[in-house]
């Protein structure tokens, strides 16, 4: 936890796919001004005082790779430098970059093919090493850098990516994969798959001076019992399906943690689960409460809390209102070796969170900065994360609002 706690306060623009179970996708009419007066955020609890959050990071997902010019090594280096300069100017101290979104690699790998996101073709060598450049550019600016890995996903659908390289282990070992809803995923139950993921993690930390490894919320892709029936019958040894699946995920998480700490104890391992922990446990088969409360699984947990103040479901429940669910996470039992940070949804700027609550907060130009105040007055929360980079720094649709949010965040971090 030394690296995570050495950070002064966290803005983590993690590009995690918006998959939280309580999240709605409804979108209000578009506009690019912020003249509306939003409701004030809830008043802090009596006696609450502001404190510096310990970590501030910017993360980039595969969805945001359009901000990079990958036409040449020089062009890529320049665009990475520009991005990281903006992070520093805002007051951030860490970047989290997605390096394996689809069983591929944004770096030179002996295990996984080059990502199609660099050249347009999976397996095609771009002629330079994006991760090596990003590590150098980050560290030259005193930014920490974490490599973000999606452990199981090979294809989101038949178009993403459209074609797998011949060298892809999902093709050379097709028996390691399972289809689900048009996508393709490694089978979490197989020891061979768990070894591949651990080996892939170690390849990154052994070859690159990254400061951490992060997994996002994508573990099991479905609750359908038919997804892994053959493996269940062969390997479950009488255990109930949900329990068995959670044990498979727990085994992977602990194996990755143990391997990292055996090789490079200072490298952090964290997971960014959904903000709705019921979904984590029952749909993703992720026992986040165990990881938080038990040493030896993770260094930090960063739930994706992408809802606004007062967020309300159609059934009238406001459990996932920002001010309530962040407190829910802060109240969960947590081992002293595990840190807690919160993910914030920059992609909601100008769009809203789809709840039954007042949406004008997302047109205020300072909603995320208000959230930083709430987090800084919530004991147990040590940092924050914003999904996602280009929605704050290069927002083509709501640029004026994003600039206002960025300015408010910068001022808040400098105060």
Language-model-detected regions and their locations in the chain:
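C-terminal motif of bacterial Sec signal peptides marking the signal peptidase cleavage site
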Residues: 18-19
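Active-site-adjacent "subsite" loops/lids of carbohydrate-active enzymes
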Residues: 47-78, 146-147, 152-207, 357-361
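Aromatic- and glycine-enriched glycan-recognition loops and surfaces
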Residues: 71-90, 117-141, 247-254
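Polysaccharide-binding and catalytic clefts of secreted carbohydrate-active enzymes
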Residues: 76, 93, 141, 170-294, ...
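Catalytic domains of carbohydrate-active enzymes, especially glycoside hydrolases
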Residues: 78-105, 207-212, 296-300, 381
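Aromatic-lined carbohydrate-binding/catalytic grooves of carbohydrate-active enzymes
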Residues: 90-126
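Aromatic- and acidic-residue-enriched segments that line the glycan-binding/catalytic groove
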Residues: 107-119, 153-181, 217-237, 356-361
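Substrate-binding cleft of secreted/luminal carbohydrate-active enzymes
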Residues: 294-323, 328-415
């Amino acid at each position: 936890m030394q690296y995570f706690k050495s950070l002064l306060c966290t803005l983590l623009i993690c590009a995690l796919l918006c998959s939280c179970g309580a999240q709605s996708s409804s979108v209000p009419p578009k506009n690019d001004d912020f003249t509306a007066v939003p409701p004030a955020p809830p008043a802090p609890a009596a006696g609450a005082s502001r404190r510096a959050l310990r970590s501030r990071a910017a993360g980039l997902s595969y969805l945001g790779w359009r901000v990079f010019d990958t036409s040449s090594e020089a062009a890529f280096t320049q665009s990475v430098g520009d991005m990281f300069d903006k992070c520093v100017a805002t007051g951030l101290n860490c970047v989290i970059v997605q390096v394996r979104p689809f069983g591929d690699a944004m770096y030179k790998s002996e295990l996984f093919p080059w990502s199609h996101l660099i050249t347009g073709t999976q397996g095609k060598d771009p002629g330079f090493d994006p991760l090596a450049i990003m590590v150098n550019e980050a560290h030259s600016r005193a930014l920490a850098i974490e490599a973000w890995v999606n452990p199981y996903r090979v294809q989101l659908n038949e178009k993403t990516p459209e074609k797998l390289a011949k060298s892809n282990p999902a093709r050379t070992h097709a028996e390691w994969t399972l289809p689900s809803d048009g996508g393709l995923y490694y089978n979490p139950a197989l020891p061979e798959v768990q070894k591949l993921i651990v080996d892939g993690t170690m390849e990154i930390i052994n070859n690159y001076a990254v400061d951490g490894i992060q997994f996002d919320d994508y573990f099991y892709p479905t609750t359908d019992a038919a997804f892994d029936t053959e493996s269940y019958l062969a390997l479950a040894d009488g255990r109930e399906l949900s329990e068995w699946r959670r044990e498979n995920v727990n085994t992977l998480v602990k194996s990755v943690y143990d391997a990292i700490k055996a090789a490079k104890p200072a490298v952090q391992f964290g997971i960014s689960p959904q903000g709705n922990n019921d979904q984590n446990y029952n749909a993703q088969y992720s026992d986040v409460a165990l990881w938080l409360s038990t040493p030896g699984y993770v260094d930090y947990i960063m739930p994706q809390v992408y809802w606004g103040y007062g967020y309300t479901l159609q059934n009238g429940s406001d459990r996932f209102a920002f001010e309530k669910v962040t407190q829910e996470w802060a109240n969960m039992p947590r081992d002293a070796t595990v840190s807690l940070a919160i993910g914030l949804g920059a992609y909601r700027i100008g769009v809203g969170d789809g709840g039954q609550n007042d949406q004008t907060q997302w047109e205020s130009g300072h909603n995320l900065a208000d959230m930083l105040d709430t987090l800084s007055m919530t004991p147990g929360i040590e940092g924050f994360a914003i999904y996602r980079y280009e929605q704050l720094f290069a927002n083509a649709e709501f640029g004026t609002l994003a600039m206002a949010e960025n300015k408010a965040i910068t001022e808040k971090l400098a105060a």
